[in-house]
């Protein structure tokens, strides 16, 4: 049984944790998904930008068990935009599960995925990410930080396959390892699937965009602990998918 069969699309979704959520049955073309965990002070900026992009049919924020009012800030930032849906998970499930939950809750054939803590994001960045996929020039785009913060620029230069800024055809998610995609392994599972299946992947430079270095938003040693957890989940995903062998040769070829 495929993962998608577990949650009928366009119907009531009961995430692990028991909070009922619903997205209306409709025929959207492009949905933006923003997984968020305790992102007050950051999520509002991202939602505000997305509300300025008319090409988006749905804006889905997954409040992944936040305790700081993340979902409420997203609602306030939307200024009543009817495209916004908040999926609230009662306990933190991790980034991968949050993204998969949103995927199950939308009928859109194209997905835009963005991190909740992006800084200096502009509407034109979003349009540059979605255009190659919507026009059939690429199966997936990946957004890489460029001339924003030297630390995050360096991170994306060294490990571009870990970026959380992507647009892709939704049906491609049927081909990723759902087990490997849990937590912070989601991007790794997606990267491996792209390499193994020969997807056309196009890089998009997000000039001026960055996010806080990994340990700063959470603060102190707690943030360092989260960073260690993130990299352990990424490593686990690589081991489970054996994707590291094909990374340099196959994954990020230019769309032609």
Predicted ranges, named:
Residues 22, 181, 188, 195-256:
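Hydrophobic helical membrane-anchoring modules
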Residues 90-106:
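Glycine-rich, basic loop-to-helix element that forms the pyrophosphate-binding segment
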Residues 63-72:
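A conserved acidic beta->alpha catalytic loop
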Residues 123-142:
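Conserved donor-nucleotide/metal-binding helix-loop-beta segment in metal-dependent transferases, i.e.
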Residues 141-153:
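Short beta-strand-to-loop element that shapes/binds the nucleotide-sugar donor at the catalytic cleft/hinge
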Residues 38-52:
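Short, well-formed alpha-helical segments that are part of the catalytic scaffolds
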Residues 29-31, 58, 189:
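Cell-envelope/extracellular polymer assembly enzymes that use nucleotide-activated donors
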Residues 111:
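Short aromatic/hydrophobic "clamp" motif used to bind/position activated sugar donors
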């Amino acid at each position: 049984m495929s993962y998608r069969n577990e949650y009928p699309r366009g119907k009531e979704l009961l995430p692990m944790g028991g909070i009922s959520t619903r997205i209306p049955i409709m025929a959207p073309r492009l949905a933006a998904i923003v997984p968020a965990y305790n992102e007050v002070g950051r999520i509002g900026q991202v939602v505000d930008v997305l509300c300025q992009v008319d090409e988006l049919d749905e804006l889905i924020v997954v409040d992944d068990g936040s305790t700081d009012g993340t979902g409420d800030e997203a609602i306030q930032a939307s200024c009543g935009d009817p495209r916004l849906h908040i999926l609230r998970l009662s306990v933190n499930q991790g980034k991968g599960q949050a993204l998969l939950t949103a995927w199950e809750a939308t009928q859109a054939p194209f997905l835009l995925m963005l991190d909740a803590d992006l800084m200096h994001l502009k509407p034109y960045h979003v349009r540059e990410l979605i255009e190659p996929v919507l026009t059939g020039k690429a199966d997936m785009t990946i957004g890489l930080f460029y001339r924003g913060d030297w630390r995050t620029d360096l991170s994306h230069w060294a490990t571009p396959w870990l970026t959380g800024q992507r647009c892709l055809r939704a049906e491609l998610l049927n081909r990723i390892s759902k087990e490997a995609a849990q937590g912070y392994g989601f991007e790794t599972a997606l990267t491996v699937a792209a390499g193994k299946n020969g997807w056309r992947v196009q890089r998009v430079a997000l000039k001026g965009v960055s996010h806080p270095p990994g340990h700063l938003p959470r603060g102190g040693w707690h943030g360092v602990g989260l960073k260690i957890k993130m990299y352990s989940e990424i490593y686990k995903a690589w081991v489970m998918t054996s994707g590291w062998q094909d990374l340099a040769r196959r994954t990020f070829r230019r769309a032609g």
